[in-house]
Amino acid sequence: MDDTTSAAPEPDRLRLLRVLGPAHVWALGVGIVLVGEYMGWNFSVGKGGMIAGLMACWVAGLLYTCVAMIDSEVTSTVAAAGGQYAQAKHIVGPLMAFNVGLFLVMAYTMLEAANAITVGFLLDTVAGMQGQTGLNQQPFIVLAIMFLAWLNYRGVLATLTFNLVITAIAFLAIVALFVSVQFGASAVPLDFSAITSDPLPYGWVGIVASLHFGLWYYLGIEGTCQAAEEVRSPARSLPYGTMAGIMTLLIAATMTWYICSGLMPWEYLGQAGTPLFDAARVTGSTGLMVLLFVGTAFATLASANGCINDASRAWFSMSRDRYLPSWFGAVHPVYRTPYRAIVFLVPIALIFALGAPLDQVVTFSILSGLLGYTFMTFNMVMFRNKWPLGRIKRGYVHPFHPLPTVVLLILCSTAYFAVFLGYGTQLSAMMCFYIVASLWFHFRRYKFVRRGDQFTMPWPKPHGY
């Protein structure tokens, strides 16, 4: 599959279809992330207690608000599949672009695997409630990934319309649980006595450690920009969909912490597999239990569905630019999807979903995402310096520059330390992986890249050049 032949003129390639609107962008971003309200975030409570979990929720919310603001400005201008990869290619350079593309692929593929694991765990939990213990989770994990890959193969409009419906239901399930508990539908009253009796069981270091899993509330919202080449109006749809998405997630995250922390002891909450579903069980309401079971299932499926979409677009874009073998850069002649990239990434997701523990998969996804956010800080500064305001048309201009960039860099640095406290070995192993991949690209792959084709945006020369 190596591109060893000389570059010859090629006929016009099939392109992805521009069929999406702001609602689909919202569904892509929130759909990927909302599963973080249904599982994973609660490990932050286990790391530092209830107060630490709440602080992690809001600090991570600030981090991702900065991400959404920065991403909306650059993506509304660089309207190409691949998102941050395309940004790095135009603004920074090839090596950074390769790494950012790899960050995206690994972050979304690992998140997809984590979602599939959660589907299996949820079904096992429900089977246990019915007295059927020892359910084999693996067939359900495989079925979930294969079905969603098939859906992505068949077309982006159907895929993200499906995401829009099930994401809306999953979000409304959280709202329904919150309202029901507030109006006395729970057999167990809300109890926040641990806030005063044991506010920080592990001290201030627990707050820092909890930030690791606090990111799970919002991880993946930046995936909205992967649809840049498939929305009808990128300059309008991407900022609207992304900013509406982060506001939705901030509301959902706060409601989730409030309900779960009030209904369950923090010691149990900190290790629960499906905290919102468990909170519904505590209420004693069969209707709420069924609703939150459906919400959990839909949230995990929506997230895995969006992850397949985003990972395949990043892999497809890198292949189209010959950063990877160009064979993967093909578009299906009927469905107009990057079908080879979709199919290729399926077995990778299955390997991790079937063979790795959930916390390790989640950590790999978080760390890959953090590396991408760190890139955004340098990317934003270079973008504003090379093309100042007024030099090129922007669909959205984020306010208070460079404050969001500085805040994002500080919070990313803190998050790295938080991950190091609990997963230092995994952090070191992941850094080694990306260093080896960078060396491979520099010495083996870069010679196939068409240097003259890298800059595709109709922009003037950078300021000072």
From Swiss-Prot:
Keyword Cell membrane: yes
Mode of membrane association: Multi-pass membrane protein
InterPro entries in the cross-refs: AA-permease/SLC12A_dom, APC_superfamily
Localisation: Cell membrane
Region forming the signal peptide: none
Keywords associated with the record: Cell membrane, Membrane, Transmembrane, Transmembrane helix, Transport
CC per GO annotation: plasma membrane
Superkingdom as given in the UniProt entry: Bacteria
Function per UniProt: Probable amino-acid or metabolite transport protein.
Name of protein: Uncharacterized transporter R00093
Organism: Rhizobium meliloti (strain 1021)
